[in-house]
Amino acid sequence: MLTTLTPAQMKALEADFMAQTGVPGSVLMEMAAHAVVEAVARHAPSGSRVLFLCGPGNNGGDGYAAARLWRMAGGDAVVWELGEPATPDARMNRTLLTLQGVTPMSAQERLPEGCACIVDALFGTGLTRPLDGACARLAALCNASGVPLVATDIPSGLNGATGAAETVFHAAETVTFHRMKIGLLLGQGPALSLIHI
């Protein structure tokens, strides 16, 4: 039987796990990044150009870490960020990425030429408001591109508790961590992507 979690339950479970085991969030972020890169490899040839979209929170940190791993594996990682990292683990992974020679930049009007895959690491399950402004424009750009998109934990714009969505990133695949998030099974969630746990 498939166990599902609400965003609040997942946050509590993760905090409890870290408190009981002493495993830091940075290690969980690295594990998440490995899973994301495995998914990217199902959609993009080895060594190809991949666009990583990173938000300010830990979802963005997963994206920075995945971009670093893709780069270390010989791929071309292009990173667009929406704001500065707001958590210590995300900041650390952004710094580690720059040490690999990748400089994150603001979102552009056009996708990078030759982009084989896009990673949506903008917002995680905690986002409850609709995407707007630059993020909504970015979703429209990516959705219209025909380039396969891998979502990190949940497609940005999808409510992780209800499955409600107005503007949302349409993913070819969503890599969700630890357990299925209830929003992926409700509302618009089931129509948005193939899901791997």
What residues fall within each predicted segment?
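YjeF_N-associated NAD(P)HX repair module
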Residues: 1-8, 12-13, 17, 115-195
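Positively charged, low-complexity intrinsically disordered leader regions
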Residues: 1-46
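General N-terminal targeting signals
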Residues: 22, 27, 34, 94, ...
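Nucleotide and nucleotide-moiety/phosphate-recognizing core
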Residues: 37-121, 130-152
